Amino acid sequence: MIRILPSTAMPRLLARRTARLAEAEGVVRPILEAVRVHGDRALLEYARQFDALDRKTVAVPAADLQRACAGLSTEFRDAVETAAANIRAFARMQVPVETLREVSPGLQLGQVVRPLDTVAAYIPAGRYPLPSTLMMTVIPAQVAGVPNICVACPRRVPEVLGTARLLGVERVFQMGGAQAIAAFAYGTRTVPRADRIVGPGSIYVAAAKKLLAGDVGIDFVAGPTEILIISADGNPRHLAADMLAQAEHDVDAAAILLTTSKRLANAVAQQIERQLVDLPTAAVARKAIQRNSAIMLVRSLEEAVELSNRFAPEHLSIPDDRLLARVQHAGSVFIGPFSTEAAGDYASGPNHVLPTSGVARLRGGLSVGDYLKVISVQRLSREALATLAPAITTLARAEGLEAHARSVEVRTGGLRGRRRPRACPTADG
């Protein structure tokens, strides 16, 4: 049964979330080096060993994509179209605005937005195939305008291949694990070198992304999935169902409920046991519930949000809008009793590729911005440069960079006067 703990137990939960990457890094280092040195030859060996590849290339033929697409049921196609429409709509909301405006006479500042050239999406296919992750990683890239989108999946899952074809993805590779990350990071004759690799994966995928972050852009290093729910008087059946929905992902997943009500805590614990009885994924979910999950009793909902901010959960469920202003750190927030986390996993629109293990303190989920470069632009008139010349040359010479100062003076004919320096602020303001 799930543990019911006092809020003072939160530090123990935080300590147990540390990603176990050190051992995995030792395993993947030789794989990365082999792919870097030997390219396709090493990649094929690993793909045959780990990914059940039975062909002479990791590239999936277009005919296979078309065949998989033709085999999709109407129900599945409709589900993809519904989810894709919302994912695309949300991604469009995130596109940065291009601008160029005059901030002072003759000085124009702005930015232009450009997509990355090549992006690789990693789609896990271990315990569960994830066509939803294909949509979450590919659609924002399409909205961003990335011209070359590649997909890697360890197995030829019909739903993944068919969804790729529905979305118009043409370059799909049957490869997984660290070898797939290395292939995209270094490039081979078959696999193009990517500017950025996105998408979740096993601990070995995470370790490979971490080690190669200096050679290729990545989204973030993701650990086991997690949800934190805050509720004082929610429906026990709903809360238990949401916790199990997270727990069934992985034995290392974490589901945490923070509540002010001991009665609710006991009711949810009982509901979890009842719902586990006929859950097909109970073997996995039960281990996650027993090992990494808990119901914690707090004094107030305000304390619950404070603890949540310390935890910085991947998914955060709160009862209503009143707590949202207090939320500082979360990958994605679900508000109200009908905003189940499963909606975000599949079809509501916001991305489900989210930071875990406290990384939500630093960033949110995968977004269009991960596929774009925002390039600053500036235009100065002769008069604007003359106005800024005293500041530029003074700062340049203070740093010992005389050529910088002269590059201004050669255009302005020397300094056009000096402004009276401001006094330094005093301690009392």
Where are the language model's segments positioned?
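Conserved NAD(P)+-binding/catalytic subdomain of aldehyde/semialdehyde dehydrogenases
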Residues: 168-254
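Conserved small-residue-rich beta-alpha loop and adjacent elements
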Residues: 101-163
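C-terminal core of ALDH-fold dehydrogenases
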Residues: 301, 306-419
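A conserved active-site cap/scaffold subdomain adjacent to cofactor or substrate pockets
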Residues: 220-291, 295
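Alpha-helix C-terminal capping segments
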Residues: 136-147, 165-167, 185-191, 209, ...
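Short, low-complexity intrinsically disordered segments enriched in A/P/G/S/L with frequent Arg
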Residues: 423-424, 429
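N-terminal Rossmann-like NAD(P)+-binding subdomain of aldehyde/semialdehyde dehydrogenases
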Residues: 1-117
